[in-house]
């Protein structure tokens, strides 16, 4: 694993047996931004057969089009923004017709039997009709929250690519329509302060997901990563 926002690290990680480069941008949970075009150019320049796969869940296709930036394959958790209502579990793989046919006929479908049920498909199609207006509001809300937290005396650091001092701000501005609806932040006082904050909220739901109709918050160290050691969390 390498930090795909670091092009030198990506370059050094490429090996003769590399068959794919997988990146997520914006990345979960630190909102790091990878330059999709630059990563794709590096990978394809090293070996034209390397597949560049981009997880576009945090951006959605409304905000970012990785295929147009050089990626070969795009994956989405359709559970999130694409559906938008927190009531399905689904995923999308987007690519060339040739690649998708290989996946459907000779790949994952044959090995796992992974087929979306009709009602999930209906709900996602319904959600896609409002993706544009939902993403516009998600972005506006996230920016407002990020700017509020940025100036708050109890907040140590805010991770949001829409902030001008975010290290990936310029790349995000170039390859995204807007900066997304997700942000992370650190509060002063460490883990105990983070847990106290999450437990004190009333209008925000404590849950592990995103892209829902409600505002959600999670504290990874005590939730999704609660079994990790302090060294692993660091």
Language model feature labels by segment:
Residues 1-154, 159:
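Conserved PLP-enzyme active-site core in the AAT-like
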Residues 155-234:
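Conserved C-terminal alpha-helix-loop-beta "cap" of PLP-dependent enzymes
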